[in-house]
Amino acid sequence: MRYADPSANRDLLGSRTLLFIFICAFALVTLLQQILYGRNYIKRYFEFYEGPFEYNSTRCLELRHEILEVKVLSMVKQSELFDRWKSLQMCKWAMNISEANQFKSTLSRCCNAPAFLFTTQKNTPLGTKLKYEVDTSGIYHINQEIFRMFPKDMPYYRSQFKKCAVVGNGGILKNSRCGREINSADFVFRCNLPPISEKYTMDVGVKTDVVTVNPSIITERFHKLEKWRRPFYRVLQVYENASVLLPAFYNTRNTDVSIRVKYVLDDFESPQAVYYFHPQYLVNVSRYWLSLGVRAKRISTGLILVTAALELCEEVHLFGFWAFPMNPSGLYITHHYYDNVKPRPGFHAMPSEIFNFLHLHSRGILRVHTGTCSCC
């Protein structure tokens, strides 16, 4: 008869005990890291229900620092950035006047929207050989006919409007109920003929003071206005008396179709003004944001409008700007509030743009709205 060695059983039991202790210790350390590393989750859970914190409270200073300490987007996981941003929403937002003025002063030196946002008779005299933004070898000679289309001077001046809303087209706007807050702004910018029909007004509002039109939309949807003139005119009437803004001098392909927009509105005796981005303004804005890490073939129209708004408005609010497939709560959203058509890959650097907006929000320079609004 063979007998089991009792010491062997004790060794096996001891090994299992050590393994169990190791697993428990590892789990405990991991749990403590989750609780203590970077943020105190339990404390924040209860703080959330205490109501919004004042902008300059110690807690909010810490939360803003957690956004600002991320110098480049690749430093943190997307979920980590979302969590930090979501935590910051418990803080009231207020404009940091000194930070905002300093930033606007920088924009004034590099870009100067009040003087160069649009081509005007003042900044682009008759006979000017205007260089395109992209086709730098291309030159457009400003003749009498084109010169008459330009306003005599910029229609807007520095800090003219108290509160502006720049409305992007992101799916983050869907079910936001931000329409009333957008409509309450003194001046509203919109991008690329977005739908503002009754189906969407609760979320996106209707007020529009400037709406941009990408010439590719005119080419694809309205056959370059060679035949489809009235349908295009009807689309613009949705925005009532909003000014129409186009990048006529971005490249040579854009010019004729952009100028045709002016002819169409004149033919239908529309009161809507037509303006064209000054190509040098677009070049300067692109260079400025490149210096802040936005590397793209072309910056988005939204970023251009935000840059201009920061000079033309005292206070700037952003709606519909979000470049991720999930909202800050981790729920999947459509790319636009009206469809899920993705952009051409590699053309814009939208995540980098949004990342910069979150920094500007944290510095009190502008406000980014990504949640549900409770206006007025």
Curated annotation (Swiss-Prot):
It comes from the Eukaryota. GO terms for cellular component: Golgi membrane. The keyword Transmembrane applies. InterPro entries: Glyco_trans_29, Glycosyltr_29_Sialyltrsf, GT29-like_sf, Sialyl_trans. Coiled coil: none annotated. The chain crosses the membrane at residues 18-38. It is an enzyme of class 2 (transferase). Involved in the synthesis of gangliosides GD1c, GT1a, GQ1b, GP1c and GT3 from GD1a, GT1b, GM1b and GD3 respectively. This is Alpha-2,8-sialyltransferase 8E. It comes from Homo sapiens (Human). The gene is ST8SIA5.
